[in-house]
UniProtKB/Swiss-Prot annotation:
Sequence positions that bind substrate: 416-417
Name the UniProt record assigns to this protein: Light-independent protochlorophyllide reductase subunit B
Any GO BP: light-independent bacteriochlorophyll biosynthetic process
Function: Component of the dark-operative protochlorophyllide reductase (DPOR) that uses Mg-ATP and reduced ferredoxin to reduce ring D of protochlorophyllide (Pchlide) to form chlorophyllide a (Chlide). This reaction is light-independent. The NB-protein (BchN-BchB) is the catalytic component of the complex.
Pathway: Porphyrin-containing compound metabolism; bacteriochlorophyll biosynthesis (light-independent)
Membership in a protein family: Belongs to the ChlB/BchB/BchZ family.
Reactions catalysed according to its record: chlorophyllide a + oxidized 2[4Fe-4S]-[ferredoxin] + 2 ADP + 2 phosphate = protochlorophyllide a + reduced 2[4Fe-4S]-[ferredoxin] + 2 ATP + 2 H2O
Pfam name, any one: PCP_red
Molecular function GO labels: 4 iron, 4 sulfur cluster binding; ATP binding; metal ion binding; oxidoreductase activity, acting on iron-sulfur proteins as donors; oxidoreductase activity, acting on the CH-CH group of donors, iron-sulfur protein as acceptor
Length: 520
């Protein structure tokens, strides 16, 4: 148990409700204090439920704390069974019920003889387990409870393990993976937990292969199905060119299908991905830029691979999944200058500030930190804001997800640079006509400082050294004149006879602080 005002991972309750709430005809009774009803709000707001979410709170109040809460729980379970008529009722423990040492299994055994629904108590530790561990354990528990031997489908088919409500773009990812598999000639037998029923769980064994889409949870259920029913599985989060191609090849090998033409089709020189990665625009905007990555295991690893593939330098990559530290180090070794595991958001915030990256890829908390320090940011992992639960298709996985992410990274870096420069040096005076704009562009070009061997400093004039000249040429033309004038004014006021890189950086810091003071 950890006392904190920000946690990257949710509680065990969050994990259990993500699994149970994603299924059909499954109702969850939460045995805890009034505050644990937050789960209903999350589903209503983030997933935009048009019906009441399938959660009922068996409230532990002052009376229950003094006299015991068993009677309240029994009454709640009976009411849920009569009113909602689910196939399964999940009685989930909370920290409060654990403190009261309530024997929920005994309640389930007694009530199970009186209810039509099957009663299940998740085998998790409400104090110790966090969201993804609870998801993994509970998903394995219900698969073990309901999966039965079934004949295989005639067509090669797979089960998709992992997509659920409240996951980061997971429902969009599910549709993209379905589309990819359909293009390869592979059928989807079942998806769990999203949209799954008891019948779905019973028919899992019809599939020839299980695909665990996220490393954080689901692999234990795949292991169970392999040991008990002999179903092979792969664990893959296909983000980026290399990981997506490996994913497609792994499916092709197990299905006995040719997949090379499909990969070539998506990576063809005339295709969107190849045209973007090899374009002058991409090379000038992305190549050599400095990025930092932080998130859950799957998305942090995938995004690090993707950034390296497009020429972006990853200064550091981190994850908050402390239990997966060794695997994380092995998956990113050599792709980032520094690889680490940390769940302290303040430490990550300070690390972002000290690194001064061109772009931040992280969670909602890193978005706040990046905004505080004026760095462009993309949210690539949960925990996320409602903005990252879009109505329009926005996958992260597969070739379509890669295309979307490339577009997002490119535009974020460009717009972030423009805003940063304008904030530093200001905009030119308003009211300038098209003719004046063209004349200023010509003037800026003609006024560009030359290399030091071709420039002499007269009275009142400043000489720019070669490095400073090169740096100025890299500034976009629409603010280049302002940058040059402000830098030279700064240098003259302080008695410099030559503009160097150090002078440029000092001027940058001066005007940036001046701009921030003006905003305040």
């Amino acid at each position: 148990m950890k006392l904190a005002y920000w946690m990257y991972e949710g509680t065990a309750l969050s994990g259990i409700t993500r699994v149970a709430g994603s299924m059909q005809k499954v109702h969850t009774v939460i045995h805890g204090p009034q505050g644990d009803g937050y789960v209903n709000v999350m589903y209503s707001m983030l997933e935009r439920f048009h019906t009441i979410p399938p959660f009922t709170l068996s409230t532990i109040g002052r009376r229950e704390m003094a006299q015991g809460s068993r009677a309240r729980l029994v009454e709640t379970v009976r009411r849920v069974d009569a009113q909602h008529q689910p196939d399964v009722i999940v009685i989930t423990p909370t920290c409060s019920s654990t403190l009261l040492q309530e024997d929920l299994l005994a309640v389930a055994r007694t009530l199970g003889k009186q209810t039509k629904a099957k009663l299940i108590v998740p085998n998790v530790n409400a104090f110790r387990d966090l969201e993804h561990r609870a998801m993994d354990d509970f998903l394995t528990q219900i698969v073990a409870e309901f999966a039965t031997e079934q004949p295989k489908t005639e067509q090669f088919s797979v089960n998709l393990i992992g997509p659920s409500y409240l996951g980061f773009h997971q429902l969009h990812d599910m549709q993209e993976i379905r589309s990819m598999l359909e293009s390869l000639g592979v059928a989807v037998n079942a998806v769990i937990p999203y949209g799954a029923s008891i019948k779905t769980l019973q028919e899992l064994t019809k599939a020839h292969l299980n695909i665990c889409l996220y490393h954080e949870y689901g692999q234990s259920a795949c292991e169970l199905l392999k040991e008990k029913f002999g179903i092979d599985y792969i664990v893959a989060t296909p983000i980026g060119i290399r990981l997506t191609s490996q994913f497609v090849k792994a499916i092709g090998e197990r299905a006995g299908l040719p997949v090379e033409s499909y990969i070539r089709q998506n990576l063809a020189p005339s295709g969107t991905i190849a045209r973007f990665t090899k374009s002058v625009d991409s090379l000038s905007a992305l190549f050599g830029k400095r990025a930092v990555v932080f998130g859950d295991y799957s998305h942090a690893v995938g995004m690090t691979h993707l950034l390296r593939e497009i020429g972006v330098r990853v200064v550091w990559a981190g994850t908050y999944m402390k239990t997966m530290e060794k695997a994380f180090q092995a998956s990113i070794g050599g792709l980032a200058d520094e690889v680490f595991v940390c769940d302290d958001f303040q430490e990550i915030s300070h690390k972002i500030r000290d690194t001064h990256p061109d772009i931040v890829l992280g969670t909602q908390m890193e978005r706040h930190s990046a905004a505080r320090f004026n760095f462009p940011c993309i949210v690539i992992s949960s925990p996320a804001h409602i903005l990252n639960f879009p109505l329009f298709p926005a996958p992260v996985l597969g070739y379509q997800g890669m295309t979307r992410m490339l577009d997002t990274i490119n535009s974020t870096i460009k717009l972030g640079l423009e805003e940063h420069l304008v904030n530093m040096f200001g905009e030119d005076s308003p009211g300038m006509g098209e003719e004046d704009t063209a004349q200023e562009q010509v003037a800026v070009t003609s006024d560009m400082p030359k290399a030091p061997d071709k420039t002499t400093a007269g009275e009142g004039e400043l000489k720019w050294d070669a490095e400073a000249t090169k740096a100025l040429k890299q500034v976009p033309f629409f603010v280049r004149g302002k940058v040059q004038r402000n830098t030279e004014n700064y240098a003259r006021e302080r008695g410099y006879s030559e503009v160097t890189l150090e002078v440029i950086y000092a001027a940058k810091a001066y005007f940036e602080s001046k701009s921030n003071q003006g905003e305040r």
